[in-house]
């Protein structure tokens, strides 16, 4: 039996030509950085340098920064990605040329109605949505929303106290994941849930399903390797996000809006109500108002952007405080002095908490919420002698920047004093980017910080945290997607008092 098929010469020629064309398709973009004299790891056909991510984004970025310096080139499949760490170039990308050249983030494939979400929308549509949503995130609006968040800190303390009384190691992700989910569903959808104690709640189940995202998911990989498939998937109504989940949230928002329009009494002030109000505000005189579908898209993206990041950031803070008891004690002293007798925090009180601010900032330096920032170059451009071709993804490796010893002496050390008022002027704003910078920074930054600080205030009023034998020291990070611990972060929770106010 012949192992080699008995094809005609024409068939063999066609097969060879097809294979050559396929190879050229999978490699033709891989010479861009070499031509420009930009160093970087060697790409593989079709895959580019994507296999290096198996070791984890963050360590890979640190490795490249150390090996190649301020500039290096990667390939996510066929997509050229230029990593930059020079603060002047970063400023140009995020601020100076944001509107003209670096407006948009990368398109990661078919996302359905979430194309209308502020984090994903592009160009003029993004500008319109940003203008309509910006009044929602002012300090005045957040102050009005503060009581909603504060009520969930009581639930947080109760859940934390249960772990303390049982004397077992407590999973920070379980506790803060529930808190984060409860706050986001309350503020984005107007729905009150107790996700830790009611895991079967439909909202809880749908949110958890929404957040099951893997960078090595077949659909994600297929559009990364073959981006021309994205329009086909969109035409077939295929999305990266489960359709039943999006339909559930869409129905929920529509029902909630209808109920609120019928009710005459004053509505509670949450993101959903503020977006509904924006449909009739003066802002829409200069911008087309948010549609109902756009409101759904923003509500869903708030969950996607806020749940994992907030719960992980809070877990990181308490891990660092547990292994640095002197810093934990100093922060508790500040909290006790600000509001004795375990009184609830107020919005204005949190603004005056200098050491709390320092601790949160230093935690976000070590574990930035956005481990990478990205912008797509819309036209050929040269910045500080670096030529960037149209279509290149410009990537800022925040995690690596925050560990650069040139800007951060002993970068692996946890030192809140780096962010004291005395030292603030020494910090380059383009080397500290936990929420990005410029016109397209994280619109929810103030909300995220408020959410984190009020939670920390309440738990540190009532508890102290200690490492236990199950605590992973030093902490290892997950190799999958978002910046989070590799294993569940377990700590011993010790009650500071026999009575817990408000819980």
Swiss-Prot record:
Heme binds at residue 442. Its main location: endoplasmic reticulum. This is Cytochrome P450 3A9. GO terms for molecular function: estrogen 16-alpha-hydroxylase activity; heme binding; iron ion binding; monooxygenase activity; oxidoreductase activity; retinoic acid 4-hydroxylase activity; steroid hydroxylase activity; testosterone 6-beta-hydroxylase activity. This isozyme seems to be implicated in olfaction. Active in the demethylation of erythromycin as well as benzphetamine. CDD domains: CYP3A. It is an enzyme of class 1 (oxidoreductase). It catalyses: an organic molecule + reduced [NADPH--hemoprotein reductase] + O2 = an alcohol + oxidized [NADPH--hemoprotein reductase] + H2O + H(+).
């Amino acid at each position: 039996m012949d192992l080699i098929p008995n094809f005609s010469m024409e068939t063999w020629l066609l097969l060879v030509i097809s294979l050559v064309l396929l190879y050229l398709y999978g490699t033709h973009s891989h010479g861009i950085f070499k031509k420009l004299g930009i160093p970087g790891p060697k790409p593989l056909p079709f895959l580019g340098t994507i296999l290096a991510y198996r070791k984890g984004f963050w360590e890979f970025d640190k490795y490249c920064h150390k090996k190649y310096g301020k500039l290096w080139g990667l390939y996510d499949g066929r997509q050229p990605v230029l990593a930059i760490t020079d603060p002047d170039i970063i400023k140009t990308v995020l601020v100076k040329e944001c509107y003209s050249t670096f407006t948009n983030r990368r398109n990661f494939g078919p996302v359905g109605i979430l194309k209308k979400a502020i984090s994903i929308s592009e160009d003029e549509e993004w500008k319109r949505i940003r203008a309509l949503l910006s009044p929602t995130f002012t300090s005045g609006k957040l102050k009005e929303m503060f009581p909603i968040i504060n009520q969930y800190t009581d639930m947080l303390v109760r859940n934390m106290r249960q772990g303390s009384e049982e004397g077992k190691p407590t999973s920070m992700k379980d506790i803060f994941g529930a808190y984060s989910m409860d706050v986001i569903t309350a503020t984005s959808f107007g729905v009150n849930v107790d996700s830790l104690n009611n895991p079967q709640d439909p909202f809880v189940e749908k949110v958890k399903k929404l957040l099951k995202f893997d960078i090595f998911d077949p659909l994600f990989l297929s559009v990364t390797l073959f981006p021309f498939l994205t329009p086909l998937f969109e035409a077939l109504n295929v999305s990266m996000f489960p359709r039943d989940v999006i339909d559930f949230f869409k129905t929920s928002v529509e029902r909630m809006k209808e109920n609120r329009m019928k009710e005459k009494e004053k509505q509670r002030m949450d993101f959903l109500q503020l977006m509904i109000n924006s449909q009739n505000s003066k802002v829409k005189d200069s911008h087309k108002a948010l549609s109902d579908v756009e409101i759904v898209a923003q509500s869903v993206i708030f969950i996607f952007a806020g749940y994992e990041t907030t719960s992980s950031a809070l877990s990181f803070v308490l891990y660092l405080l547990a292994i640095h008891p002197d810093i934990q004690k100093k922060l508790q002293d500040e909290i006790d002095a600000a509001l004795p007798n375990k009184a609830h925090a107020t919005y204005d009180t949190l603004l005056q908490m200098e050491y709390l601010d320092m601790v949160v900032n230093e935690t976000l330096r070590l574990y930035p919420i956005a481990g990478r920032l990205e912008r797509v170059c819309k036209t050929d451009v040269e910045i500080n002698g670096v030529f960037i071709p149209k279509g290149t993804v410009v990537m800022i490796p925040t995690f690596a920047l925050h560990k650069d010893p040139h800007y951060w002496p002993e970068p692996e050390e946890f030192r809140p004093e780096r962010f004291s008022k005395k030292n603030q002027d020494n910090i380059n704003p383009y080397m500290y980017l936990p929420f990005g910078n410029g016109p397209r920074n994280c619109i929810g930054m103030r909300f995220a910080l408020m959410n984190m600080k009020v939670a920390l205030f309440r738990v540190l009023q009532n508890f102290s945290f200690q490492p236990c034998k199950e605590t992973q020291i030093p902490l290892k990070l997950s190799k999958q997607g978002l910046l989070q611990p590799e294993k569940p972060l377990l700590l011993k929770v010790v009650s500071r008092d026999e009575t817990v106010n408000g819980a």
